[in-house]
Amino acid sequence: MALWGGRFTQAADQRFKQFNDSLRFDYRLAEQDIVGSVAWSKALVTVGVLTAEEQAQLEEALNVLLEDVRARPQQILESDAEDIHSWVEGKLIDKVGQLGKKLHTGRSRNDQVATDLKLWCKDTVSELLTANRQLQSALVETAQNNQDAVMPGYTHLQRAQPVTFAHWCLAYVEMLARDESRLQDALKRLDVSPLGCGALAGTAYEIDREQLAGWLGFASATRNSLDSVSDRDHVLELLSAAAIGMVHLSRFAEDLIFFNTGEAGFVELSDRVTSGSSLMPQKKNPDALELIRGKCGRVQGALTGMMMTLKGLPLAYNKDMQEDKEGLFDALDTWLDCLHMAALVLDGIQVKRPRCQEAAQQGYANATELADYLVAKGVPFREAHHIVGEAVVEAIRQGKPLEDLPLDELQKFSHVIGEDVYPILSLQSCLDKRAAKGGVSPQQVAQAIAFAQARLG
């Protein structure tokens, strides 16, 4: 059924109807639409539009419909209703007759859909926060199990300084913690109810909107009706959080894809998250990680698309806003799926400690330690930097690590170098010296793990 029509003398062209209808995607708001309708029916009692008996009849019918939807959601898409609001109202009228036609009194689809979408966002943010914290916990557990796995850290994808696999895991814990914080902040701003704002100018019925907001689980009601029906900041905020979160997951995936290569060989992924080749029998491809990386682009696209949709809209509601849902639904679904998949990748990952350590000992990753040693002996850092660079060139020429150069050769570059340099150049020394807060020393990593465990509970 259409919720409009008296103004029109011709039926809508079928092509326009297909173009205009949104049920194929806003069916996902069915539960929220029904919950909002129950609350609205209670509000109508307070202003005398419905009796308590009528409201009870409507609420009972709506609750039955809610259970029907949960049991068989596909029934919605079997309808030719324009949108989810039309579908719910039509089903309600089927159940209670003319009484169902009283429910929309004082309400517009503009404030109705704004409310539905905010309720859906609140539910989905809760799911995202749970998945985010589960992935953080998986990373912390992986870190705890790999505190002694020394590996090279990289800048410019060149070996730079030794780190541990645990320290690498904890870097992503920090990123995910910021993602969690962004979601919590966004939740605060979207937790205001637009219901009761009507089409744009407010409702003509003296409904207590704060009470109505409380019935729906919102912290408060919105303050301006024009803004309320045209506000989609919460969509942009969640898309932005998703875009940033997916960048983090994409980087996580890229790191592990590299670590999993034959050239690096630092980790081996579980068979449960890899696939083979239809031609090459030996292949074990990191498809789960590649898909996480690949799906990042669609989320960025959803954010950009929504910004472009909203940028030129006058107040208040415009049909353009119907375009807010598909991108949002897809982006948050994608983010949620990728959070779950990233946790699954960590479940069963094998860190190849000998290969990690071998790589950490290559590439002159201890060169900075030699520079710091010279500084401790009174050599200015810039001069020490130059001296070590020359020593590295000589070590490369001889095909040796720095610690294998004899003392007399090292002293050619600086007379202050003594026998005490060799312990300094060990991998363990490289780690131990990074003992300031946030560093890679075993003590700092252990503290970071303990802090994360306490925060995550």
From Swiss-Prot:
Location of this chain's protein in the cell = Cytoplasm
Pathways involved = Amino-acid biosynthesis; L-arginine biosynthesis; L-arginine from L-ornithine and carbamoyl phosphate: step 3/3
In alphabetical order, the GO MF annotations are: argininosuccinate lyase activity
Q: Name one GO cellular component term.
A: cytosol
Q: What is this protein called?
A: Argininosuccinate lyase
Alphabetically, which GO biological process terms does the record hold? arginine biosynthetic process via ornithine; L-arginine biosynthetic process
Q: What is the enzyme's main class?
A: lyase
Keywords in alphabetical order, please: Amino-acid biosynthesis, Arginine biosynthesis, Cytoplasm, Lyase
Instruction: Quote the InterPro entries the UniProt record gives.
Output: Arg_succ_lyase_C (IPR029419), Argininosuccinate_lyase (IPR009049), Fumarase/histidase_N (IPR024083), Fumarate_lyase_CS (IPR020557), Fumarate_lyase_fam (IPR000362), Fumarate_lyase_N (IPR022761), L-Aspartase-like (IPR008948)
Look up keyword Cytoplasm and say if it applies.
Answer: yes
User: Belongs to which family?
Assistant: Belongs to the lyase 1 family. Argininosuccinate lyase subfamily.
Primary location recorded for the protein, binned into one broad class: cytoplasm
List the catalytic activities from the record.
2-(N(omega)-L-arginino)succinate = fumarate + L-arginine
Show the coiled coil region(s): none
Might you give the EC number(s) for this enzyme? 4.3.2.1
UniProt cross-references to PROSITE patterns, sorted A to Z? FUMARATE_LYASES
